[in-house]
Amino acid sequence: MRLLMIWLAMAFRAMAVELPPKELDCMEKNAYFEAGNQHYEGIRAVVAVTLNRVESDIYPDSVCEVVWQKYQFSWTHDGKSDIPANKKQFAKVKEHVAHALRDYKGGYKLQNSMWFHNHTVNPKWAKHKRKIATIRDHTFYGDH
């Protein structure tokens, strides 16, 4: 039984998008600051957008470069600490990110969504995009 459990754990891990530690840290922080107050679906959507950008030809080729690209994610230029304050919540986000990476490799790409915004703002760029989904307090978009 123990051998079966080990094999299943290894197989499950092999099905996930694998990121180097620094890239994973950028992804986890992006998920925490953008959707850390949300359930799994919101975090999974932020992970999908981030990876969709990495895979696209119009954004940088790494998670950290996508996350830290100027004015792409609000938390990276808000003047506040980039260290997650709520360690318990950050631990939960890390779990959700791990699951989201498996979902992404399994085909969940939120219809190739590349942009999102919080409902508290109304960005001009949104009117030029195709609305794909609303998940909690975020709306996600793709190209027309």
Regions found by a protein language model. Name each.
Residues 17-144:
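Bacterial extracytoplasmic/cell-wall-associated proteins, especially those involved in peptidoglycan
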Residues 1-9, 13:
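Sec-dependent signal peptide recognition
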